[in-house]
C-alpha cells in the first residue's frame, strides 16, 4: 500500500485541466500543463535532487525536500519561484529525513529525522526523532525521541510513515501500523488508534501506510488497508475511511490481498477510486488497474496494464485520466472510464519517485 489520500471536497469538481509539478533529476521541479500535454516551466532547485514534495493546505506553496544535503525548498505556486531554501547539514552532521508536512501557517515543518555525526574515525547514526524545522530561522528547533511502539513506523525507511498537522495546528498525526496522535508542541501522545481490529471478525495487523496527498478537505481520508487473520494468516485488503476531527474509522473488506497495491486515487466527486495491483514475480508478474465504486465499496472494473519495476499512480485534476509515471522519462496516460491506454508524454528527463503535486 503506497498511497493514503485525503478526500476531495464535495463541491470541487474541476472542469478544466490543471498543472502537474514533477520533481526531476538532477535538481528541478518541472511544471506540466495537462491540457497542452507539455512542459510549460522549469523551476531550478538550489539544494539538490528532490525526494519529497507536498502542497500546502491553502494550495499556495509547495514544499520540496532534497536529498543531497538534506534541504528544504519552498515554491510559490502563483509565480513558480523558489521563495525559501536552506540545508540542514553541517560539516560534521547530517540530518536525514524523507517527507514531512507544514503547519497551517507555513512557519514550521514537521518530519522524522535521523542524525548522523561524523567523527575522526567513525560515524554515529542516531535513532529517528520527531523533528520541528523553523522555516524562517532555517534550522531544527526541536526534536523528541520516539516511543518504542512508534519505532516500527520509522525504523525501516525512516520518516516514510505519513504525517499531517490538524487544521488548528495543535495536533500531529502519523499514519503507519497504527495512527498516532501527538501534541504538536511537545510530541506527547494524545491517543493511539490501533488498526488491529477492523469491524469484520478475526482480522488483525491492519496497516494504513503511505504518503498523504493533500487535496481539498482537511482531515478526511480514504485509504487501502491490508489485514490478515491470526491463525492461517489469510491476507485481505479493503477500503478505510478516517476522520481526523472525530477520530472515527470505518473499514470495509473487499477481498483477497494482491501481492502489491500502488496507491489509491480518488475522483473529485468522491464516487470513484482507482489503484494498480501487482501479482506474481519477475517473468510471471502481472499488473491490473482496479476501479472502485466508493458508494458501494466494490470493485467495478479491471484491466491489465504493463508492469513497471517502479512506478507511481496519479490522477488528473478532473478525474478523467490516470497517470503512470516515476523512475523514468515518460508519463503514460490512461482513460479512467475505460482503463485503456491513450498516449505517452515524453518528458526527456528522469522523474524522481517523490510523487507529484497537482493543482487546478
Predicted regions and their residues:
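Short loop/turn segments that connect beta-strands within beta-propeller blades
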Residues: 34-37, 76-80, 134-138, 184-188, ...
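Short coil/turn segments that connect the beta-strands within blades of beta-propeller domains
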Residues: 17-18, 58-60, 105-107, 168-170, ...
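Beta-propeller blade signature
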Residues: 125-138, 236-244, 287-293
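Repeated scaffold domains used in trafficking and secretory/extracellular systems
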Residues: 49-55, 93-102, 151-164, 199-215, ...
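An edge-strand/N-cap motif at the start of beta-rich repeat modules
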Residues: 16-41
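Short, conserved, GDST-rich strand-edge loop motifs in beta-rich repeat architectures
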Residues: 111-127, 219-234, 276-286
